[in-house]
Amino acid sequence: MAVTGIENVLQQLQATALSAANGTPQDGVAQGTFSSELKAAIDRISDNQNHARLQAQQFEMGVPGVALNDVMLDMQKSSVSLQMGVQVRNRLVAAYQDIMNMQV
């Protein structure tokens, strides 16, 4: 089993840390509106869930090359991304309620 997935994540983290230290935006990152960024995040969560579901189905059917550890890792990634999305939604709702309760 290759560890290239971890190496890619480490490279992305290092690039993010470097660009944050330099104060420059990352290459290829477009400045979008809030709604487009929110939609993109929801799409990524959906893609993670679909990929994990597909991996699990392939493992259950006995497709060669699909290992149990990969399935479990994808399922956990999917779970964590969904939990993150729910927490972001909760924060947005709380912020909206705070704004709505402000007196004018």
Swiss-Prot record:
Location of the protein in the cell: Bacterial flagellum basal body
Keyword annotations of the record: Bacterial flagellum
Biological process annotations from GO: bacterial-type flagellum-dependent cell motility
GO cellular component entries: bacterial-type flagellum basal body
GO MF, one annotated term: structural molecule activity
Domain of life the protein comes from: Bacteria
A Pfam family it matches: FliE
Family statement: Belongs to the FliE family.
PANTHER family assigned: FLAGELLAR HOOK-BASAL BODY COMPLEX PROTEIN FLIE (PTHR34653:SF1), PTHR34653
Name this protein carries in UniProt: Flagellar hook-basal body complex protein FliE
UniProt organism field: Edwardsiella ictaluri (strain 93-146)
Lineage per the UniProt record: Bacteria, Pseudomonadati, Pseudomonadota, Gammaproteobacteria, Enterobacterales
Gene: fliE
